[in-house]
Amino acid sequence: MATSTNSQDDAALSAAQAAALYRLMTWLSPAFPVGAFSYSSGIEWAVEAGDVVDAPTLQAWLAAMLSHGTGFCDAVLLAHAHRAVISNDDDALRSLAELACAYVSSRERHLETTAQGRAFVEIARAAWANGRLERAVADCAGLTAYPVAVGIVSAAHGVPLAATLHGFLHAVVSNWISAGARLIPLGQTDSQRLIAALEPAVIATGARALIASLDDLGGATFRADLASLQHEAQYTRLFRS
């Protein structure tokens, strides 16, 4: 039987590290009830329009959304929300919460991000309440976009920003793939291939967002933004966005 000779491999997580990992995995799990399964971020219209028809076209669509659209922008907002809570900058957090809600490209995307944000905060407060979280929620004083909510909760509980960013982007991409798989449709193996194929983009986007300023917010995914707008008038649909 092989025995590890690397002491780092065998080192146990500290109690704080284990708690942070446990909470992050819980909060960003598909089982965490924020209703993500009911939103497609416009992918449903892209399938109907013929832009997304199989695994390769879905991969290309999602890679663009991740690197140059919603994925990157949401990650930047998350990072700045996390830092505002850590630094106790109430004014910055309040301003960021307003910016995040104003920044979305369509009515349905606004519903998608604020409904999930509200659910995320409410459930986290009920199950993992603490004073810092209550203060941050009070600072927002209104609608909270999903990435801002994740940034607030993770910072309030001391979960490191870099890990939170990568976990968040993985969760977002996984939900997009799940929506695409139901619409095209795709099998489970193809879905996992897509998750594997998008791993480099998730890592790169998280790294970019970690050092980005709010001036870097912006996208180049006009077709995806149009899909989100067109979905509002789509006659037959499974998803809310």
Swiss-Prot record:
InterPro entries: UreF, UreF_sf. GO terms for molecular function: nickel cation binding. The keyword Cytoplasm applies. It is found in: Cytoplasm. UreD, UreF and UreG form a complex that acts as a GTP-hydrolysis-dependent molecular chaperone, activating the urease apoprotein by helping to assemble the nickel containing metallocenter of UreC. The UreE protein probably delivers the nickel. Required for maturation of urease via the functional incorporation of the urease nickel metallocenter. Belongs to the UreF family. This is Urease accessory protein UreF. It comes from Rhodopseudomonas palustris (strain BisB18).
